[in-house]
Amino acid sequence: ERCIDDEIPFEIPESWEWARFFSVVDIASNLVKPELYANYLHIAPDNIEKATGKLLPCRSVLQDKVTSPNHLFHEGQIIYSKIRPLLRKAVIAPFDGLCSADMYPLKTILNGKYLLRYVLSDAFNLQVATAMSSRVKMPKINQKELSSILIPIPPMQEQEGIACGIDGLLSKIALL
């Protein structure tokens, strides 16, 4: 495996550390038959607003006429679109449901809001673009590429403060 020290994208405070995505995030793949979850809400990439982390209105698995296996996800997991990832379609699931197989349900040991904000960031997406640079067809990030991405990890209290601060600023912006 490559050495993190050779890849550090920017400086971080001494109390923080760098980690690879896979060491703090589990891609919680759990493909299920949609007919067994007909009344669950369904999230597809189209249900997530670009670059904001906002969930748009969703319909049930039955209403969306889902026929192929989808991932069962749980409230609090981050749903991340692996198709055209530079559109930055990611959201914290506000409920248990099913998501398209074109998405990854992510389970993390980090503060979920902190991870979401980092996944939506330019720093993360520059690494995504670099990881996918050899792809010529449909832009898509696979698990191996995603797992190698670096994440700056502040202490948990700072993660919470960062997430809270960003949410507060976004709330003020929304009022403008």
Model feature map: region roles:
Residues 11, 20, 72, 78-82, ...:
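Structured core elements
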Residues 2-7, 22-33, 45-75, 93-95:
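Sequence-specific dsDNA recognition surfaces
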Residues 41-59, 78-99, 113-117, 126-136:
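Short, ligand-facing micro-motifs at secondary-structure edges
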Residues 17, 26, 48-50, 85-86, ...:
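Short, glycine-/Ser/Thr-/acidic-enriched flexible segments
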Residues 21-31, 54, 95-96, 104-153:
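Basic, amphipathic alpha-helical recognition segments used for DNA target recognition
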Residues 45, 143-146, 167:
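ATP/adenylate-binding site constellation spanning eukaryotic-like Ser/Thr protein kinases
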Residues 37-39, 73-75, 99, 145:
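Short, well-ordered loop/turn elements at secondary-structure boundaries
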Residues 2-32, 152, 156-176:
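Non-catalytic DNA-recognition/assembly elements of restriction-modification systems
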